Amino acid sequence: MTFDIFPAVDLRGGRCVQLVQGVPGSEVVSLDDPLVQAVRWADMGADHLHIIDLDGAIEGTRLNAPILRRIVGELEVFVQVGGGIRSRSDVAEVLDTGVDRVILGTMALRDPPVVKELAEEYGPDRIMVALDVRDGRVTSEGWQRTLEFDAIELGIVFESFGAGSILFTNIDTEGQQRGVDPEPTRELVEAVSIPVIAAGGVSSLDDIKLLSDAGAAGAVIGTAIYTGTLNLREALELAKTL
């Protein structure tokens, strides 16, 4: 089993940003050119990227497709993309840019059977479902709406519909650089057989080890590598040993 590191490139208004718990206006990082940042992570050895269109996720306005095409065209790395993908045409448009995998959040939660249809059309490996959890409950609409479901029951449902992987985000620790709580990840991993990528609060090499020990197939790292709290090269070297 390999453990993959996904540096995060979050897009907001044409810039590369990092928010605290996904709250608009809480930027702790705001950089002019997302492509420059993506190239930087690739130059450090990253062979995976996690790109989120925050304009799409928060406001439903997907304005960053040109930036996405530039990143995909420039780099030969595995790219997964989410944020504001709310229709079949959105899925087709994003996959048409050349990305490897789309992340379905609100769309999947509104209409779970669509996951099965998309997995059959594009293949399970290209369809990831996002389970973003706050206080034990799954959220939608860019983390702004809390649902009466927990991640485990939904994870089982989406696996049965053919999702190839799950992105599990712990919003309670997202963007705070205070470390991870591996137990919710472990519980989800034990309930499903498809890969689970963990996100939220990864800020040290120990956090990466904890998530690997919990059974995660990889981790998204954002704020910590932008602020220098965590060295991406060291994280990538550690991942090779897990």
Swiss-Prot record:
Family: Belongs to the HisA/HisF family.
Gene Ontology BP terms: L-histidine biosynthetic process; L-tryptophan biosynthetic process
Catalyses which reaction(s): 1-(5-phospho-beta-D-ribosyl)-5-[(5-phospho-beta-D-ribosylamino)methylideneamino]imidazole-4-carboxamide = 5-[(5-phospho-1-deoxy-D-ribulos-1-ylimino)methylamino]-1-(5-phospho-beta-D-ribosyl)imidazole-4-carboxamide
Gene Ontology cellular component list: cytoplasm
Keyword list, A-Z: Amino-acid biosynthesis, Cytoplasm, Histidine biosynthesis, Isomerase
Pathway as given in its UniProt record: Amino-acid biosynthesis; L-histidine biosynthesis; L-histidine from 5-phospho-alpha-D-ribose 1-diphosphate: step 4/9
SUPFAM superfamilies: Ribulose-phoshate binding barrel
Active-site residues, Swiss-Prot/TrEMBL: 10 (proton acceptor), 132 (proton donor)
EC numbers for this chain: 5.3.1.16
Chain segments annotated as coiled-coil in the UniProt record: none
Enzyme class: isomerase
Main location: cytoplasm
Compartment(s) of residence: Cytoplasm
GO molecular function: 1-(5-phosphoribosyl)-5-[(5-phosphoribosylamino)methylideneamino]imidazole-4-carboxamide isomerase activity
Gene3D superfamilies: Aldolase class I (3.20.20.70)
Protein's gene: hisA
Name the UniProt record assigns to this protein: 1-(5-phosphoribosyl)-5-[(5-phosphoribosylamino)methylideneamino] imidazole-4-carboxamide isomerase
Domain of life: Archaea
CDD domains per the UniProt record, alphabetical: HisA (cd04732)
Pfam families, A to Z: His_biosynth (PF00977)
